[in-house]
Amino acid sequence: MTTLLLVHSSARTGGSRTREMADILTAEWHARGDNHQVRVVDLADTPPPHVDAATIRHFFGLAGAEEPATASLALSDTWIEQLLQADALAFAVPMYNFSLPSTLKAWLDHVIRPRRTFRKVADGELEGLAGPKPALVMTASGGLFADTSLDHLRPYMKTALAFMGIDSPRFVDWEGTARADIDPAAQRRTVTAQLREWVHAC
C-alpha cells in the first residue's frame, strides 16, 4: 500500500482553490491503482492547539516532564506517526497575509519534535528523521506573490520540511485568484497537469 498524507489548512470548506487542487490530486493518486490510498488531516475540522508549556517540557525532557502527558502531546504523537508512516506528503496551503495559515504553523510545531522527526548528531549539527520522501505544497493566493519579497509561505515550508529531512518539495501554485485578468479555467488546466506530473513521479 502506498499512502499519501494530505494536510488541509484552508479555513474555507467551500470555494477554496487549495481544496480544489487537493481534489484533483486525490483523483490522480487513486487513478494509480487500488494500492494507492490517501489519508486526510483537515486542520479546519480539528484545529491544532498552540503548543503549551507542559507539552514543551515533554518535547525537550525539561523539569516537569515526568508529569502526566497532555492531550496536546497525544495529538503530537498521532500526527507524527501519520507523517512517518506516509510514503508521500501533500499540503494544501492558501496564502494568508503573505504566509501560511496559523493552523498549519501549529501543526508543524507539533510534528517538528526532537528525537522523533529530528535529532542532534553533534554540537550544532542536526539530522532530519522524517525523510526522504516526496512532498508537494499546493498554494493559492489572490495576487502574484510566489518567489517575491512578499512570499513568506514558500521559504518557511521549504525550511520546515528540510529540517525534518524532507528536501526539495514541489510547489504547485494557483495564483491571481482575485484578478480579473487571469482565467481560472486556464489556471485549473495548468495546475492539473502539474499535479498529474508529480503523482506519476512519485
Curated annotation (Swiss-Prot):
Function per UniProt: Quinone reductase that provides resistance to thiol-specific stress caused by electrophilic quinones. Also exhibits azoreductase activity. Catalyzes the reductive cleavage of the azo bond in aromatic azo compounds to the corresponding amines.
Entry keyword annotation includes Amino-acid biosynthesis: no
SUPFAM superfamilies documented for this protein: Flavoproteins (SSF52218)
Binding site for FMN: S10, M95, Y96, N97, F98
Oligomer and partners: Homodimer.
Protein name: FMN-dependent NADH:quinone oxidoreductase
Cofactor binding: number and manner: Binds 1 FMN per subunit.
Keywords, comma-separated and alphabetical: Flavoprotein, FMN, NAD, Oxidoreductase
Recorded name of the encoding gene: azoR
